[in-house]
Amino acid sequence: MSARELAEKFFGHVEAGEVDEILGMVTPDATVSLVALNRHGPMAADGASYLRELARAFPDLMVRVRRLFVTADNTAIAEITIDGTQADDFLAVANQEKNFDLDQAWMLTVTPDDRISAVIAYWDQNQLYRRLGVKRLDQITITAG
């Protein structure tokens, strides 16, 4: 399977909320960097936790891959848009049943044996908060937890 096909499969699993299938695609020591959250660590822990929360909060999540290319070192770089309607608290933002869309950039490092060894994701966290109806980040009543 090519790095491109692997990335397409990865984002299909993200859209379907199939975290266990994603974990089956990564190496045992795969890392994740969710840059907007300043969360860096093992994919099996930090990545899985984020993806499970995303799937729970947005059961109707859609992932549209807008651009996808593979570099010479077999890194798949994808520009995606995610959208859905919030159905549960997400990243400490109380559920207001807001529909949102968010552009993201993801980098998946693919090994020669077609496994993902590193995931890096970027997005504008303030844009995410605005889309979910957070007007002021200093008003605790808007956020849960």
Please name every model-derived segment.
Residues M1-M25, D29:
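Short acidic-aromatic low-complexity motifs
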Residues M1, E5, G41-A45, N95-Q96:
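Residues at secondary-structure transition points
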Residues D20-E21, T27-A76:
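A solvent-exposed, acidic/Ser-Thr-rich amphipathic alpha-helical stretch
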Residues S2, A55-G145:
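A beta-strand edge to alpha-helix "cap/lid" segment located at domain peripheries
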